[in-house]
Amino acid sequence: MAITRRQFIKRTGLATAGTVLGPGLFSNMFVRHALAFSNRYFIVLFLDGGNDGLNTVIPVSNGSGTLRTDYETNRKTGPGGIRMTPAELNGTLVGTDGLTGGQLAIHPGFNDAGAAGASGGLKSIWNEGRLAVIQGCGYPEYSLSHEESRNIWETGNPLFYSPYTGTGWMGRYLVGNAVSAPPPYTATDIPAVNIADSVVGEYKNTGTSVLALRRLQDFGFPYDYDYPSEDAAKEIAFESLYGTAAGSGNATVKYIGNTGLSTESASQQYPQTHGVYVSARSSFNDAYTNGLNTGTARGFREIAKIIYSVERGLVSGVNARFFQLSNGGYDTHSNQGGADSNGQHYELHAEVGNAIRLFWEDLKTMGAGNTDIRNKVTILVWSEFSRRIPQNDNGTDHGSQGPMFVVGGTVNGGVYGSHPNIDPDALDNNENSPYWQGANPGPAGQHRSTDFRDVYGTILTRWLDMSQATVLSSVLALDAGPANDYWTAANFNVGFLP
């Protein structure tokens, strides 16, 4: 499929460049082009629409509290009901809540039969001890707007501190880890790829190039089929224009030039990973494409193609190690369903769980000599908000805090954080669980929230080797406000990474 010139430029971070940082910091970033190198990969999976956390990590028993009783109060049975019974959850039991000791389960969709290589979904990865379930993830003064809340999570900036407006938390990591020499990434390399139509919020930055595409085999320089005789001249002109800009003494112009050149180089290099992967791993390619045949599976297939080429050193110039993809449909105001395999929420979780499971199997033999590289990969799963605690007629409305998942070969599997207090008397005026950073439990029965920035910080420090001081000075900013109600102290040891 041909792409337009406008789309071609949009495929990298060029479209996101701007004067969003202070002049001193901005110019300093451009002096350092390369990134601190490691052999690790990091993948972000976004559940678009607001995933219902209460029906994703479900109380099965009360423990010392009333979680199960409160769940049954808020979620009904019968026509339109989305409550799940303990019997329906028996196959997806995970750990217990750290505060109350109540038994928890993940949604039965995460134990779907799937296709060959994908059976068992996320539950099977839990059984292997490599799935972390992090409860009650949120931020202060939560927003019920899809766009605003997604922007908050992507920027890591709930209170809109100006130094971080317009750039993503991973984008700031990529820029902040630039080093002078030896250069694992040059000024025109691409450290990150988004399986999307344009660069997503997490990766927006003003110092590195990020590639956005849907299918590797479709990505290429936008030749003109009506005037093919002019194609070579147009590509030469493109290289000349952006090459001149790359040599500029102006930092902004230099970045634009390097981004244009990286786009043009990527159009020659990255599509090669498709043929290499399909030829060598046809059974997995078929399992993604025909076995599961879902958008999430196809997204992981594109990531697998790149990682395979990087691990085997098969395509010169391909060295991306940071990725993002998404799965939509989680805005379940109606017809959400419960444990029924035909239900909307079940199908969404089955799609995600089966795609991750198949990718997990693919990684087992992806390394040189068919070695297992799962210990090089960490996957973070998040959504812009959870859903309201009481259900509506047959679905759920916009909510506040909810669970995150982390999958990886070095992940310490388990349940982390406290399940939100869902007692109707403990909910706020929107019938959502409030954000709380004080004593656990709080004086009004509040359960301590896991600030999503502590999850990010744990990944940045324990997976990507940033110091806590660097994270807090260049990637994430602590809040100013009462300690019980705001993120005023970091905890970058949530526990899910060694």
Indicate where each model-derived feature is located.
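Feature for exported/extracytoplasmic and membrane-associated proteins, marking the mature portion
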Residues: 2-354, 358-368, 390, 409-412, ...
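Histidine-centered active-site microenvironments of extracellular/periplasmic hydrolases
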Residues: 383-416
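Beta-strand segments within the central parallel beta-sheet cores of soluble alpha/beta enzyme folds
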Residues: 324, 374-382
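Proline-centered loop/turn at the N-terminus of a beta-strand
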Residues: 130-132, 378, 403
